[in-house]
From Swiss-Prot:
CDD domains linked to this entry: enolase
Protein name: Enolase
Pathway connected to this protein: Carbohydrate degradation; glycolysis; pyruvate from D-glyceraldehyde 3-phosphate: step 4/5
Gene Ontology MF terms in the entry: magnesium ion binding; phosphopyruvate hydratase activity
Organism phylogeny: Bacteria, Pseudomonadati, Pseudomonadota, Gammaproteobacteria, Cellvibrionales
Catalyzed reactions: (2R)-2-phosphoglycerate = phosphoenolpyruvate + H2O
Length: 429
């Protein structure tokens, strides 16, 4: 009854108004699963390929009809008749049919949408929540935890049209006892921050991920205004709430130097390590993502040596959810955490492999959205199913972000004590 009988694909819109792929997998039992592929703005050069049409007369060249057609023909013919419970076999069949390292023939957006839709259909057929099915696939049934949300409340870089160089300034409610309490703390900080920015005469429009995007005199000023919001909300910095950065350094790495144009400062790699180390010493920053360019492995080693014993150093563009690259990073003791994005690698099975490799090596795994999202909430189930312990899914507004938080609230209500919220203990520092 779990045999695939039909697969359909559609061109739909993401949260930025750009086309993306939705896939629907129908099983013999009548069970249906649907999923959408997300899309990134600041992307690693070694990510799996998001197949776009390039036809400038439609969606400024960003249409995905080719990827949709690949699902409705090649992938459908490949998978109809196969068992949706055998996720690894489905993913392998699509990967083999594509035949490239970066999924450039069928498109990572096509393969991923079908991969996730098949998992959802299988969960429906089994009459279990998606997180339970993913935990079964992961070989960790019943071993759940609720993730600490890393809430991006000030946006800069590629995620906003402002002069702030660092892409994300985040808060983590590590002192909360439950996910629901953590979400409330984050929301209260968010609303206090909005009032503070408004009273300063600063812009309270939001960026791609729902965070505010004001022009500020420096990156450090973003931290200072967040600290005021935390205190105004009635919480203790460093105890109830900690801070995190996503530098997205590849976006301002030029000719071997880190150019913070918004501040008019240029750093060598070693100097930028010292800059980040200084911020981590001055403020309770417990996580820094992409603190170095994806190609600056010597710089990554330097940063890891300087602060890796007390700060979680997350590789996003560095590792692109790819086990081959992650393995090399682990061997060279580069970073101590990996950001997990489905569409960087392009299938559920490969995503689970990356999480397992990280956890087995003592690295943390942070489950993440993309800046171009949809109403799809699969990452919430993934975070709980793999006991990853951390999730990045934006700020406390925009339904493309809040939908993931709301899904996590429902999961926590279902699981109760079977999915503990561990707070500060989840971080590599």
């Amino acid at each position: 009854m779990t045999k695939i009988v039909d697969i359909k694909a559609f061109e739909v819109l993401d949260s930025r108004g750009n086309p993306t792929v939705m896939a629907e997998v129908i099983l013999e039992s009548g069970a249906v699963g649907s999923a959408c592929a997300p899309s990134g703005a600041s992307t690693g050069s070694r990510e799996a390929l998001e197949l776009r049409d390039g036809d400038k007369s439609r969606y400024l060249g960003k249409g995905v009809l080719t990827a949709v057609n690949n699902i409705n023909t090649t992938i459908k013919n490949l998978l109809v008749g196969k068992d949706a419970l055998d996720q690894r076999a489905l993913d392998k069949a699509m990967i083999d049919a594509d035949g490239t390292d970066n999924k450039s023939v069928l498109g990572a957006n096509a393969i991923l949408a079908v991969s996730l839709a098949a998992a959802k259909a299988a969960a429906v057929a089994k009459k279990v929540p998606l997180y339970a099915h993913i935990a079964d696939l992961n070989g960790t049934p019943g071993k759940y935890s609720m993730p600490v949300p890393m809430m991006n409340i000030i946006n800069g870089g590629e995620h906003a049209d402002n002069n702030v160089d660092i892409q994300e300034f985040m808060v983590q409610p590590v002192g909360a006892k439950t996910f629901a309490e953590a979400l409330r703390i984050g929301a209260e900080i968010f609303h206090n921050l909005k009032k503070i920015l408004h009273d300063k005469g600063l812009n309270t429009a939001v960026g791609d991920e729902g965070g505010f995007a004001p022009n500020l005199p420096s990156n450090e000023e973003a931290l200072k205004v967040i600290i005021v919001a935390v205190e105004k909300a009635g919480y203790k910095l460093g105890e109830d709430v900690t801070l995190a950065l996503d530098c997205a350094s590849s976006e301002f790495y030029k000719d071997g130097q880190y150019d913070l144009a918004g501040e008019g400062k240029v750093f060598s790699s070693a100097e930028f390590s010292d800059y980040l180390a200084d911020l981590a010493n001055k403020y309770p920053i417990i996580s820094i993502e992409d603190g170095k360019d994806e190609s600056d492995w010597d710089g990554w080693a330097d940063l890891t040596n300087k602060i890796g014993n007390k700060v979680q150093l997350v590789g996003d563009d560095l590792f692109v959810t790819n086990t081959r690259i992650l393995k090399e990073g682990i061997e060279k003791k580069i970073a101590n955490s990996i950001l997990i994005k489905f569409n960087q690698i392009g299938s559920l099975s490969e995503t689970l492999d990356a999480i397992k490799m990280a956890q087995d090596a003592g690295y943390t795994a942070v489950i993440s959205h993309r800046s171009g999202e949809t109403e799809d909430t699969t990452i919430a189930d993934l975070a709980v199913a793999t006991a990853a312990g951390q999730i990045k899914t934006g700020s406390l507004c925009r339904s493309d972000r809040v939908s993931k938080y709301n899904r996590l609230l429902r999961i926590e209500a279902e699981l109760g004590a079977a999915a503990p919220y561990k707070g500060r203990a989840e971080f590599k520092s």
